Amino acid sequence: MAENNNEEILLLKKEVNYAVKLLKNGQINEALKIVEALIKKSPNVPLLYNIRGVCYQTIRELGNAIDDFSQATILKSDYAEAYCNLGVTYQEKGDLVSAVNAYKNAIDNDNNYPTAHNNLGKIFLASGEIDSSIEHLECAITLKSDFADAHNNLGSAFLRINKLNDAIKSYKKAIALKPDFAVANNNLGIAYLRTGNPKLASKFFENAITITPGYATAHHNLSGVKVYKEKDKQLNLIESLLIENNLSQKERIYLNFALAKAYEDLGNHEELFKHLNEGNRIRKKEMSNSIADSEEHNELIKLFFNSNNIKLTYRDSLPIRPIFIVGMPRSGTSLVEQIISSHHEVYGAGEVNNFHNIIMPIIEKHAVNENYNLKNDEFALIRKQYSNSLERFYANEKVITDKWILNFKTIGFILSAFPESKIVHLKRDARATCWSIYKHYFSDEGNRWAYDYQDLARFYKSYLGLMDYWHNLFPGKIYDISYEDLTSNQEKETRNLLKYCDLDWDENCLNFYTNTRAVKTASAVQVRNKMYQGSSDVWRQYSEYLKPLLDALK
């Protein structure tokens, strides 16, 4: 900073400190007036633009905030704090590319800036760049060991790659540093749920709600692990929250789904469907794509495959052989993965969207040019990229399961790139499957068709059509297993399943409920219990309310 700027700051120090005090006290307009007057007197002082930027950021005038933080960095090119504030503002605006660049500039000018490392790690976490996320979050903690938010974010990064013990340790550290950290309590509950401990999960969801009674996500999570009884205090709390006008749409979705679960437990069908329909209605409004887009995409995929362009020969051997478990959500895929991954030679990776993320850009590129023939080297690249993506699981087993169920869309690409892979397809009664889908909230944006009876039925039929297509194109390559048969003839179906997967018999596969691996899906509790029958008939008691869905499925 130039000497005259330093002198100006010294002269204006009293007024600057007063403006900062007002800002910290929440008196934003008063602080703005003082800073604007100071900028008119001293237009080349970067600190003033940074302070005014924080004022604008606080009152959500993000465009003005970006202008001021940018001006501060122009006047002082090594101004790490202004770059970091600029990153926060871009992040709040949804411009993550610009946010990443701003945080990197902050770190380039001050590598010992824990906030910048934490914020950058959080973006990498959201984008699925887990290794980079962990690197920056650990750096933030090294620089500031009592950084509760960084410990919480690191826990979430570990959770993404199924390192549950590390995740739990990080969340506990965050809570120890900040006992009233509601988000960390909720996240610790999620981690315990994935280990198969609903009792501990419930405790931390309840802690989160005690700290923040309006925490909609925690209410929804708690609803999934408890059985409600009459006069439950949580019911009254959620009902009162829904009356408030300042709730976000996302919060209303979580609370309606939570109430629906509660009224399902209580046997109040009318209230169950009142809240279930409302939650689904709001959730559908959030979705940008229509069911027609999903149907068209399924038809588009078929164009890439015919008897002339399927190549199934590779000379290289894979370090670990994949088993892809596919089907509709809520069809029993989590149960089957739990069974297979109980085998001593199998690592259960859970829902891995790696193949989807690799193949979709390739599909889009070819579709734009109406070129539906993939070259051998493209399949070889897909094979290499997906194989490399599995390395982050550090699995020592010979076989790995991938339960990204919507991989049913890309079976042709999977078998072309991995002819040695196994495809296990779950089949379940359509009515049971669709009812179970409709009553569950999916955080994944890919299930845009799940929140409306007609959309759900249309997608189900499109799914059946695509599976028929793959069966005809790859006869004998896809193993169908019926959920109903599996639950009624457990040992017979398990033996047949393992035989198809080229796995020797392992008694542990019958005792799948003792498997302690992480389970990320809504079935995390169910797969810890012994197999039970009858779940495919539960929809019948709601047939009066489900008539539009049942008619659409015919």
Residues of each region from the PLM?
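Conserved alpha-helical positions within TPR/SEL1-like repeat arrays
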Residues: V16, V20, K24, L47-T58, ...
